């Protein structure tokens, strides 16, 4: 039997949680959900790329499990069978076979669970349900929505059925329409939807939207404190940094999984690399964070100031490790709950440290005479404009940024204090064939090295200009590094790879 792949996808694909008769059950589902016509054809037509061919072969180890699929089918279509007058006959046939094979009591028990739609029924059935994705957050040049759409498209390419709820076009309260429904998974990207409460102000809406929930969180976990104090079953956080996963587990008691965002490539012919070194990012606002510290009451001001000094002095520490040292300085011993409360109160210091080192990295490059091309309004009046080799261009969208990287021989990344992380910017630069210039992160160890990119240490910025000049002065070496980085990144950091890994997460639950 040959079936159009799109028909298979729309029906929910093969249900791998069934131990046997997977193709049979899928064909039943297709017939139940859409009009089907059987047409006799030749083998050449069946072999077309848009067709999926099924045969009658079962894996030997699964041949004795078909009765469970029969029970599941009876549970799934019980209403239709009763309406057609076949329900009792189908039950009798399944039980007669069970009697003959000596598993009558086991079958009765399992069948009752399927017809009654107990937990095991939904465990199986959810695997053929659509994946619900929340999108529509316009922050950061729409990057969160782009992530949601990229992952969704990759899942569809793997045969998954994906539904989107656009939070920009719809009131988030409209998510109530999904109450009581089951999904293969529910995915958000830095989404507040998982924090929506019911009218009783006790329970959360997603306690009643069934299926595993996954929320990408791309910042330090301290910023998400108001949204991660809820606890309900089957909720997981996807993070880009292993130290963030550790933070979630320790301080929020939340299951967190290292799952960095993937890169994207501009779909275009080869372009001339007209820039030596680019930075596609904002200048930041160190002075803004200093002003915030000055405005705080004395105890908080002192704590925030010491926190900032510690982060500046020890730039390779995680934010929480630097805050621990800050507390030690004042002789403060706190419980985990108190630690989070205190750190949340001074969380803006993290931005201060990020912007301080972004300024220092870029100024170090400029002082060495290297030309740096930057993009966006934030550079127009920044202190670094005094350097004639800082070349400012108009702002770019995410898609235009991909083109800039294609035009760059190398491009700079300064981590937003992700000490164990990997970002879409890093992946995108390498996939564009530019050499990535980045501060070190624990994620790189064992995955990339200086044959793939330029890695610098925030504690030794004096070494950075020499590293850049060395590669810019040797085009053959630059091309080797760029190609090595691109090859590794295309293998491990595409959205198609993330879709594959996400489905593995679901399969291994």
Predicted regions and their residues:
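N-terminal pre-catalytic "stem/leader" segment of glycosyltransferase-like enzymes
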Residues: 105, 119-212, 343-346, 352, ...
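Glycine-rich, charge-decorated loop segments at or immediately adjacent to ligand/cofactor-binding or catalytic sites
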Residues: 221-235
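Active-site proximal beta-strand in glycosyltransferases
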Residues: 40, 204-220, 236-239, 278
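Conserved nucleotide-sugar donor-binding catalytic segment
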Residues: 1-73, 84-85
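Nucleotide-sugar donor-binding catalytic core of glycosyltransferases
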Residues: 129, 134-147, 251-419, 441-444
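C-terminal, non-catalytic tails of nucleotide-sugar-dependent glycosyltransferases
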Residues: 60-121, 371
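Structural motif
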Residues: 184-187, 212, 236, 410, ...
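Catalytic binding pocket for nucleotide-activated donors in carbohydrate/polymer assembly enzymes
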Residues: 132-139, 146-159, 163-170, 230-231, ...
């Amino acid at each position: 039997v040959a079936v159009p792949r799109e028909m298979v996808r729309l029906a929910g694909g093969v249900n791998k949680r069934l131990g046997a008769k997977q193709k049979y059950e899928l064909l039943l589902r297709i017939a139940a959900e859409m009009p089907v016509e059987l047409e006799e054809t030749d083998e050449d037509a069946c072999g077309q790329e848009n067709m999926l061919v099924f045969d009658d072969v079962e894996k030997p180890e699964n041949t004795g499990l078909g009765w469970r699929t029969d029970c599941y089918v009876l549970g799934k279509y019980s209403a239709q069978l009763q309406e057609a007058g076949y329900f009792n006959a189908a039950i009798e046939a399944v039980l007669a076979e069970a009697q003959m094979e000596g598993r009558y009591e086991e079958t009765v028990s399992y069948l009752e669970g399927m017809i009654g739609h107990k937990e095991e029924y939904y465990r199986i059935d959810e695997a053929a349900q659509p994946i619900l994705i929340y999108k529509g957050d316009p922050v950061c040049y729409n990057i969160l929505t782009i992530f949601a759409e990229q992952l969704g498209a990759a899942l569809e390419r793997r045969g998954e059925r994906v539904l989107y709820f656009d939070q920009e076009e719809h009131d988030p309260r409209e998510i109530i329409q999904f109450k009581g429904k089951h999904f293969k998974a529910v995915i958000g990207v830095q989404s507040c939807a998982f924090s929506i409460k019911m009218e009783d102000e006790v329970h959360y809406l997603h306690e009643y939207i069934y299926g595993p929930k996954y929320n990408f969180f791309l910042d330090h976990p301290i910023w998400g404190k108001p949204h991660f104090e809820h606890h309900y079953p089957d909720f997981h956080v996807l993070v880009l940094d292993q130290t963030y996963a550790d933070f979630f587990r320790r301080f929020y008691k939340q299951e967190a999984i290292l799952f960095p965002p993937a890169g994207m490539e501009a779909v275009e012919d080869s372009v001339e690399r007209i820039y030596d070194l680019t930075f596609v990012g904002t200048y930041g606002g160190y002075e803004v964070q200093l002003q915030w510290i000055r405005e705080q009451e004395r105890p908080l001001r002192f704590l925030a100031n010491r926190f900032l000094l510690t982060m500046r002095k020890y730039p390779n520490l995680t934010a929480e490790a630097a805050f621990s040292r800050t507390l030690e300085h004042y002789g403060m011993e706190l419980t985990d709950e108190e630690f989070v409360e205190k750190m949340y109160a001074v969380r803006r210091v993290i931005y201060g440290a990020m912007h301080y080192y972004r300024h220092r990295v870029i100024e170090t490059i400029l002082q060495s005479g290297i030309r740096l091309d930057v993009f966006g309004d934030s550079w127009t009046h920044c202190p670094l404009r005094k350097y004639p080799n800082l070349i400012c261009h108009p702002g770019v969208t995410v898609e235009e940024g991909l083109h800039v990287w294609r035009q760059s021989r190398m491009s700079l990344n300064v981590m937003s204090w992700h000490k164990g992380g990997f970002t879409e910017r890093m992946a995108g630069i390498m996939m564009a064939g530019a050499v990535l210039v980045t501060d070190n992160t624990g994620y790189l160890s064992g995955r990339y090295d200086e044959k793939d990119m330029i890695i610098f240490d925030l504690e030794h910025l004096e070494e950075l200009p020499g590293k850049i000049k060395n590669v810019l002065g040797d085009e053959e070496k630059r091309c080797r590094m760029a190609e090595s980085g691109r090859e590794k990144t295309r293998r491990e950091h595409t959205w198609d790879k993330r879709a594959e890994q996400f489905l593995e997460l679901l399969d291994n639950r």
